[in-house]
């Protein structure tokens, strides 16, 4: 077997084929709204973060599952164009995950999505070297069993694990103890520990699962993190917004740039 080159980050998680539909405003119930255009683009939570890391100069690998439809070809072509080492497992007779995304004139998006259960990535479809020949692992936890297996291998190899968690998927409790950097949406810490105050729930989350850092993204308010010694709050940049689709994914890519794995990559380059 040919040994894989070491990459700076490997992502295991969702991809999706997004149809972006700009509209002047979100439709009221029972109304009709003319849309400006409809653009089909590859996206997805982990896939987008990996692509951003690649475009910012990191060496990247992506592992995920697609159908056997034209959308899968779009993803393969885009990963290849950008230089991402992609391992795309095909689900026969199945459509790739798709999303229809309404984006209003203020840039806020509303996502309608569909994912066939046959797109679930299974642990036995992973190869250990995809994970261990890297300096960092990024997961979203959607296909929980596969994420747990990948995180186990990463931890055993001393590789930091970063998670983008926006929902409490079944079995997620098995993943949480194997995370170094847990970054969630605003509501997740409270749902996990039963405390809505982030200045209490983030430390409780870190203590319970042993993460190096816990953080919650706050949309236009920024992000709040707890590293075990102090809180770190960073406000969001104030920009003229065109489209918020993928904003969180890009934030996670930015965070990956500053993990210890990134520091090691910088010093060894």
Predicted regions and their residues:
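Conserved phosphate-binding/catalytic region of the ribokinase-like
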Residues: 1-8, 34, 198-269
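Glycine-rich phosphate/adenosyl-contacting loop at the front of the ribokinase-like
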Residues: 1-65, 72-74, 240-242
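A glycine-rich helix N-cap at a beta->alpha junction
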Residues: 78-93
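Conserved phosphate/ATP/ADP-binding segment of small-molecule kinases
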Residues: 151-233, 240
């Amino acid at each position: 077997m040919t040994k894989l080159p070491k990459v700076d980050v490997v992502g295991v998680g969702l991809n999706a084929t997004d149809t972006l539909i700009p509209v002047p405003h979100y439709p009221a119930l029972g109304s009709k709204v003319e849309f400006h255009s409809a653009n089909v683009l590859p996206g997805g939570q982990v896939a987008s973060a990996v692509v951003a890391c690649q475009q910012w100069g990191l060496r990247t690998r992506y592992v995920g599952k697609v159908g056997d439809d034209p959308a899968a070809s779009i993803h393969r072509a885009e990963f290849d164009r950008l230089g991402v080492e992609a391992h795309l497992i095909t689900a026969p007779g199945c459509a790739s995950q798709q999303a229809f995304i309404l984006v209003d004139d203020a840039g806020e998006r509303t996502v309608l999505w569909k994912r066939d259960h046959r797109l679930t990535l299974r642990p036995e479809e992973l190869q250990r070297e995809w994970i261990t020949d890297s300096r960092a692992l990024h997961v979203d936890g959607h296909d929980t069993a596969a994420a747990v297996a990948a995180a186990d291998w990463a931890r055993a190899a001393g590789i930091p694990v970063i998670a983008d968690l926006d929902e409490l998927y079944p079995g997620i409790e098995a993943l949480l103890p194997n995370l170094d950097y847990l970054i969630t949406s605003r509501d997740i810490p409270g749902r996990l520990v039963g405390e809505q105050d982030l200045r209490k729930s983030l430390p409780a989350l870190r203590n319970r699962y042993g993460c190096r850092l816990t953080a919650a993204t706050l949309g236009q308010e920024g992000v709040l993190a707890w590293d075990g010694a102090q809180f770190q709050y960073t406000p969001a940049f104030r920009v003229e917004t065109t489209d918020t689709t993928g904003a969180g994914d890009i934030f996670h890519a930015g965070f990956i740039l500053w993990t210890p794995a990134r520091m090691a990559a910088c010093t060894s380059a």
